[in-house]
Amino acid sequence: MNIQSILSDKIKQAMVIAGADQSCDALVRQSGKPQFGDYQANGIMAAAKKLGLNPREFAQKVLDNLQLSDIAEKLEIAGPGFINIFLNPTWLTTEISAALSHKNLGIQATNKQTVVIDYSSPNVAKEMHVGHLRSTIIGDAVARTLEFLGHNVIRANHVGDWGTQFGMLIAYLEKMQNEHASEMELQDLEAFYREAKKHYDEDEIFAEKARNYVVKLQSGDEYCRTMWKRLVDITMQQNQHNYNRLNVTLTEKDVMGESLYNPMLPSIVEDLKKQGLAVENDGALVVYLDEFKNKDGDPMGVIVQKKDGGFLYTTTDIAAAKYRYETLKANRALVFSDTRQSQHMQQAWLITRKAGYVPDSFSLEHKNFGMMLGKDGKPFKTRTGGTVKLADLLNEAIERATVLINEKNTNLSNDEKQAVIEAIGIGSVKYADLSKNRTTDYVFDWDNMLSFEGNTAPYMQYAYTRIRSIFNKTDINSTALLAAPLTIKDDKERTLAIKLLQFEEAVQTVGKEGTPHVLCAYLYELAGIFSSFYEHCPILNAENESIKLSRLKLALLTEKTLKQGLTLLGIKTVEKM
């Protein structure tokens, strides 16, 4: 249940009755200060200005036509024309009880869509590195969230599984097989790629064979396709190990690599020529876009086919957009890649639309993200300046979490301790990233992310475990608890109840904008509000049984909300810490 949406609809209806245009916006927002209510409608002044009316007089007209008696206990006009909304405690109790009994905490599926989410996208025959982390975990959090909201989500792992380098890789794989190299040697993909490149650069006979294999692979030669498939499978098996460690939902079934779109490319280029969009320039085929200018102020040229007949990433991305609309029947396609890809994606999609391959109703969204930086403010590297392998980063996270947990005086079994170490180690890396606005760069800092204070995974995981411990101290039957009446009298109870009912607002924002940090911020605020409630309002030692049960209901919904929210982020919780 989305309070903001409900209030927006009702206030807009009243604004229209009072004379505003149908396109008006109530601009309902959560209030920053209690004295200004729980929500504020800030759109009155703009509507009044259009009508040539006094804003406060128009605000009164809106109130006269506003039906909010069940939701709000008080409405007031403030300042030049804001409407402050104070929610009704009786309504809050009803909605809290409804959320507790609903499997999705009161969130109903509406306007179901098919959404393709393109994320992770590592390259074949190369190991995943830290540069793949953001796309993988941000994309996965959004995929989980959209599924939770009732949408049909199609995960598309757009792996780099095609290109001229595959002739070189197939030739080297063949050489290894002929020399009876063990399978283990293939497990070090970086070394495999490096050796293949070395042979290509230094051995002309090898290089010629590699070039021949490129031609054969592209023409569908069975032997080359088999060798190529083996390279893809070996790579994706290793990637799957990283995905499993990261608690990411991607599987081999989600692989939709560049090769998938290969058969489409010649006909797309031919069609772009027929439509007059692509023209020849120095042997290459180029689409000139008036919407983008080069340094001389002329329309920018985007190459869709090289002089040698080869296709480019732009051509593949045009085909991918077309495929996702025509074949996958998607309503939206979200691509999670770094900000440096923004112009490339916008150009590919502009050509896609100009060619009529997708309608305006099909939403193509580049969810760009910034870089992970070291403490020196430069791109995150190893001490020697090399690229950090993702597996090495996760290993270090586990090592640091092990030291952290061993320092704590815990009464956990070895299995319980290991579960906590895994949850905190991997969770810390993920949460540190997810809690930052994806469009900005952020500094990777082990000390901050492993802290039990602040907006971190350990703090959030501990907040959940702390609430679980309350229920471990009571033998109250869950059915009896759900049936018990809920009363909201204390201000701390009221604040907690409202924050709990704002869960859907945060989740809907993540689904719409692709911004998991909004959910992180919500969960952190919720944990802080619960902590204040817990200190101020005794639960197990409440003055009577009815207050105890009522507060336990608030605690139970907080526990469920924290767990569900962290699950959407792909962060594991533990029952004991």
UniProtKB/Swiss-Prot annotation:
SUPFAM superfamilies: Anticodon-binding domain of a subclass of class I aminoacyl-tRNA synthetases, Arginyl-tRNA synthetase (ArgRS), N-terminal 'additional' domain, Nucleotidylyl transferase. It is an enzyme of class 6 (ligase). The keyword Iron does not apply. It holds the Pfam family Arg_tRNA_synt_N. It comes from the Bacteria. A motif ('HIGH' region) lies at residues 122-132. The keyword Repressor does not apply. GO terms for cellular component: cytoplasm. It is found in: Cytoplasm. Its main location: cytoplasm. GO terms for molecular function: arginine-tRNA ligase activity; ATP binding. It catalyses: tRNA(Arg) + L-arginine + ATP = L-arginyl-tRNA(Arg) + AMP + diphosphate. Belongs to the class-I aminoacyl-tRNA synthetase family. Monomer. This is Arginine--tRNA ligase. It comes from Haemophilus influenzae (strain 86-028NP).
